[in-house]
């Protein structure tokens, strides 16, 4: 559990607590906030966070693999249309459960989020169609860095200096873990880089709406899905007309994969929104980087895949970055006892 003082946190629960909740129940210690205070009321149940994190990770991994299967095996050359279908199914799925009344200022923020949401999905699927799945994961490992910078610039969030320092080994380590396995030159990374930047911005916007405007996940997904669908459907009509032959009505396997991809997208987005409401934008993407390392380790254990030396270096860097991010105050206290850290001047520390 992170030992940072409350003012250094950018959210309400870190992914270290998510891992603790998923691993098993622990005895609750004394509350950090007085009972009845706003901070105490915002503390989420660990079981809810663990469940949202598990669903988010599984749905995200399954959706990425299935989308890549649709693009490569079935030859579906319309990534913008697929993104539009994702948003259409999300609007239909959330129609009954969404709250309709919304203040005018909130609607404007939701429309801006819809623009970011739709553009990031489009860039991500266009890039995924052109590059290997591992390379797509490599590019997205820089998302925590973009999210941290955007949360500080747009929301004024304060971060512990050691949390800032942890971004280096965290992002570099995950990138090295995947880069060590590449045997082909990277192509088409421009769309993935754009999607990564927009994904960080989208998470910051979502976190603000969920935590400050008190919107629930279903309402926010419904409110953003309709404008995003209009944007993506229009882009698909203009940019993908005549690019590839449309799928035939009798291609049942392709349509089944597309429907499953849409349902996974709804599940992924709902879990992502719930996790953002319970934790923070940065914590979500830090947790996502840990899964990159986990995928490589599982590949080694289950399938006997051989990892390069660079991959092992990347795993070590990522784990060290995770430890530093979630134990920044503990590291600062240890360094202060040895004269390496001055608490009154944190910017001159490690």
UniProtKB/Swiss-Prot annotation:
Residues 19-30 have a biased composition (Low complexity). It is a multi-pass membrane protein. GO terms for biological process: transmembrane transport. The chain crosses the membrane at residues 51-71, 73-93, 110-132, 135-155, 218-238, 258-278, 279-299, 312-332. Keywords: Membrane, Transmembrane, Transmembrane helix. GO terms for cellular component: Golgi apparatus; membrane. Residues 19-42 are annotated as: Disordered. Signal peptide: none annotated. It is found in: Membrane. GO terms for molecular function: antiporter activity. InterPro entries: Sugar_P_trans_dom, TPT_transporter. Its main location: membrane. Residues 125-179 form the EamA domain. Belongs to the TPT transporter family. SLC35E subfamily. Putative transporter. This is Solute carrier family 35 member E4. It comes from Homo sapiens.
């Amino acid at each position: 559990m992170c030992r940072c003082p409350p003012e250094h946190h950018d959210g309400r629960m870190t992914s270290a607590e998510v891992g603790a909740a998923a691993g098993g129940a622990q005895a609750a210690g004394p509350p950090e906030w007085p009972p009845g205070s706003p901070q105490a009321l915002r503390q989420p149940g660990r079981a809810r966070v663990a469940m949202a994190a598990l669903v988010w990770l599984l749905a995200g991994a399954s959706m990425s693999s299935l989308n890549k299967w649709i693009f490569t095996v079935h030859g579906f050359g319309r990534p913008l249309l697929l993104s539009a279908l994702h948003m259409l199914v999300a609007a239909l799925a959330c129609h009954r459960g969404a709250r309709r009344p919304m203040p005018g200022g909130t609607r404007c923020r939701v429309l801006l989020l819809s623009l970011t949401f739709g553009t990031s999905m489009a860039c991500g699927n266009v890039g995924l169609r052109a590059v290997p799945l591992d390379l797509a994961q490599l590019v997205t490992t820089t998302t925590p860095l973009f999210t941290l910078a955007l949360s500080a610039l747009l929301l004024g969030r304060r971060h512990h200096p050691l949390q800032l320092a942890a971004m280096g080994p965290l992002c570099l380590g995950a990138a090295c873990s995947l880069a060590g396995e590449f045997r082909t030159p990277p192509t088409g990374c421009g769309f993935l880089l754009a999607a990564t930047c927009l994904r960080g911005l989208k998470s910051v916007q979502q976190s603000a709406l969920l935590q400050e405007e008190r919107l629930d996940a279903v309402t926010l997904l419904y409110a953003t899905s309709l404008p995003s669908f209009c944007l993506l459907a229009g882009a698909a009509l203009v940019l993908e007309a005549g690019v590839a032959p449309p799928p035939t009505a009798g291609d049942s396997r392709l349509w089944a994969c597309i429907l499953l991809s849409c349902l996974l997208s709804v599940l992924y987005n709902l879990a992502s929104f719930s996790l953002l409401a319970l934790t923070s934008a940065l914590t979500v993407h830090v947790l996502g980087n840990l899964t990159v390392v986990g995928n490589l380790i599982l590949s080694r254990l289950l399938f006997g895949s051989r990892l390069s030396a660079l991959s092992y270096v990347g795993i070590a860097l990522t784990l060290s970055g995770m430890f530093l991010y979630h134990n920044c105050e503990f590291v600062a206290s240890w360094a202060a006892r040895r004269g390496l850290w001055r608490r009154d001047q944190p910017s001159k520390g490690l």
